[in-house]
Amino acid sequence: MAPALTALNRCFVLGILLLVTAGTAFSQEVQAENVTVVEGSTVEISCHLHQYDGSIVVIQNPVRQTLFFNGTRALKDTRFQLVEFTQKVVKIHLSDAKLEDEGGYFCQLYTEDTHHQIATLTVIVPPDNPLVEVKEQAVEGGEIELTCISPRTKPAATLRWYRDRKELKGFTSKQENGKTFSITNSIRFNVDRKDDGNIVTCEASHPALKGQKKQTQYELDVQFSPTASIQPSQSLVRDGDELNLKCEVTGNPRPTEIIWTRLNDSLPDRAQIQGDLLSFPSLNLQDNGTYSCQVSNKHGRSSDQYVLVVYDPGAIIEAQTQVPYAVIGGILALLVFLVICILIVMVWCSVRQKGSYLTHEASGLDEHGEAREAFLNGGENHKRKEEFFI
């Protein structure tokens, strides 16, 4: 009885092993690989066959529409192309992959039992160049708020602000739109007129970019009140010379109108105005006076004055020779004064040190003199004592 039970157990175990082996063999008849593709690119979907015996192979899309039936096209979507069908593998190419193509593709093998594997297709959406929006017009002394936007990415992109190669910390928000994300990064900072025209950069990074960055540069537009400055074409002029006065203007918005006037008088008839230029083709002594240019915009106004002095030929030569010598003379006088001060200090220090030395020397002589006198007096007394005893 015992040998019979042992044989029965062996048959049972062998049957279990055969079933497990058969199940393993069947599970390996078809295999699929998960793939990832960038939106708009081409991707390959593969179904690997094991122990293929010519049975029917069907490839279906995520909504279970049949793409290929045993190598024959079944769906009129020409973006799907069968590129290989052998006893080991079935390969199809999907061109211009879209987000709607994402999902599980079924590799089905019809034998005595139906076996299938799912190849999961993941479509990632890289960001375009980010958009930059400004909340309101910036004015000097105020703040500016800029928002960088990446409206459609998958997975969510990372946005950063940079200025002068230094990152600016901002506030980031994320909004989900179906399978994609909209990302924003906002910054605020104080601005002055010197910031007008400076560049800030918004940078987007994403796994699909493979280490590259998408950037958008924004030129700061900071409005400020105008300034005016008159610059002459030459500083010294004489009767008959030509002179151009230019009113150099800054401001945002830039002033479009420049008003030239003459203090307490009208402009000379010969003077010509061409925008920021006030020209005198031929000067004479009657053109002497104070000239002014005035500009304005919505943030303020500004003006500058220039005193015009027209010399005759002799006066202009004298003025040209006196100005350099006056400057040089002033410099030389200052140097002489400094040298005299230094000499006085040196002499005072020298006299002070010498007086101290003479005082000490005199004190020493007095001491030696007293000692010598005492010695001599002592000698005389001794002689007197000797004479007395004799």
UniProtKB/Swiss-Prot annotation:
It is a single-pass type I membrane protein. InterPro entries: CD80_C2-set (IPR013162), Ig-like_dom (IPR007110), Ig-like_dom_sf (IPR036179), Ig-like_fold (IPR013783), Ig_sub (IPR003599), Ig_sub2 (IPR003598), Ig_V-set (IPR013106), Neurexin-like (IPR003585). One of its GO terms (cellular component) is membrane. Pfam families: C2-set_2, Ig_3, V-set. The keyword Membrane applies. Residues 348-390 are cytoplasmic. Residues 1-27 form the signal peptide. Keywords: Cell adhesion, Disulfide bond, Glycoprotein, Immunoglobulin domain, Membrane, Repeat, Signal, Transmembrane, Transmembrane helix. The keyword ATP-binding does not apply. It comes from the Eukaryota. Residues 28-326 are extracellular. The chain crosses the membrane at residues 327-347. It is found in: Membrane. Residues 28-122 form the Ig-like V-type domain. Belongs to the nectin family. Involved in the cell-cell adhesion. This is Cell adhesion molecule 4. It comes from Xenopus laevis. The gene is cadm4.
